[in-house]
Amino acid sequence: MQTTLQITPTGATLGATVTGVHLATLDDAGFAALHAAWLQHALLIFPGQHLSNDQQITFAKRFGAIERIGGGDIVAISNVKADGTVRQHSPAEWDDMMKVIVGNMAWHADSTYMPVMAQGAVFSAEVVPAVGGRTCFADMRAAYDALDEATRALVHQRSARHSLVYSQSKLGHVQQAGSAYIGYGMDTTATPLRPLVKVHPETGRPSLLIGRHAHAIPGMDAAESERFLEGLVDWACQAPRVHAHQWAAGDVVVWDNRCLLHRAEPWDFKLPRVMWHSRLAGRPETEGAALV
């Protein structure tokens, strides 16, 4: 293992910055140390890695299988089109990809709307604005621990449906042929029903499983369910349970999707932001859900 490896907690209930390591040349002992730190902190930040796409994919695969989005192991999350131009920045002119980018500025966990939710993600920055565009992470383990007894008892009794179609509909996104968005998650006919409390399969810690895709709690009417879930997210995603990362080109982060929520922050949409995302596949036996 690299003897210069340093892990520095962020000061929030989650997250640590890792230095003294290059992910492209990480040996098995080094990865074992990082994996243990990942389970402890749930978010690891690696400044200045400057990984190629192939190097990012190789690193991501050390965690297990990759959830293939649009048929690939890595996908651009960007307001820059394939021809190099920046997507329309005016809300009236947003294409579906911009609507997904803006939708992801609400707190969420990845792929909860799929039959098997993701276990995590490797995310890197290629082009970032000087101001804005941070990614924020919220610790749902600590949020669960801080619940009052009545709310804790209630969330243990409840589940919610998760749907990208539902969450994106709030931005007027209706997937159609020729869309700028690849359609991942928008063509799912069966809706996963997930308990509001998820027990981490490796650490055993319970956490809240909520976010923008969650809705329609059985046993509550639509308005009551929405009020309850929105209030729970607003309460949960507060200091000291939140860390915001200001990106620099070359940074890499790895987060545990099984116990964190995340969201992007706005930036001047006239400026380019190019990020690369490799989603770590969950296991059906622990991240699967009943479909309704």
From Swiss-Prot:
Pathway: Xenobiotic degradation; 2-(2,4-dichlorophenoxy)propanoate degradation. Its EC number is 1.14.11.43. Its cofactor is Fe cation; L-ascorbate. Induction: Repressed during growth on high concentrations of 2,4-dichlorophenoxypropionic acid (2,4-DCPP). InterPro entries: TauD-like_sf (IPR042098), TauD/TfdA-like (IPR003819), TfdA_dioxygenase (IPR051178). One of its GO terms (molecular function) is metal ion binding. Inhibited by divalent cations, most significantly by copper and nickel, and by diethylpyrocarbonate (DEPC). Optimum pH is about 6. Keywords: Dioxygenase, Iron, Metal-binding, Oxidoreductase, Plasmid, Vitamin C. Fe cation binds at residues 108, 110, 262. Coiled coil: none annotated. It holds the Pfam family TauD. Optimum temperature is 25 degrees Celsius. 2-oxoglutarate binds at residues 135, 247, 273. Monomer. Involved in the degradation of the phenoxypropionate herbicides. It can also accept (RS)-2-(4-chlorophenoxy)propionate, (RS)-2-(m-chlorophenoxy)propionate and phenoxyacetate derivatives such as 2,4-dichlorophenoxyacetate (2,4-D), however it can only accept 2-oxoglutarate as oxygen acceptor. Belongs to the TfdA dioxygenase family. PANTHER family: (3R)-3-[(CARBOXYMETHYL)AMINO]FATTY ACID OXYGENASE_DECARBOXYLASE, DIOXYGENASE RV0097-RELATED. This is (S)-phenoxypropionate/alpha-ketoglutarate-dioxygenase. It comes from Delftia acidovorans (Pseudomonas acidovorans). The lineage of its organism: Bacteria, Pseudomonadati, Pseudomonadota, Betaproteobacteria, Burkholderiales.
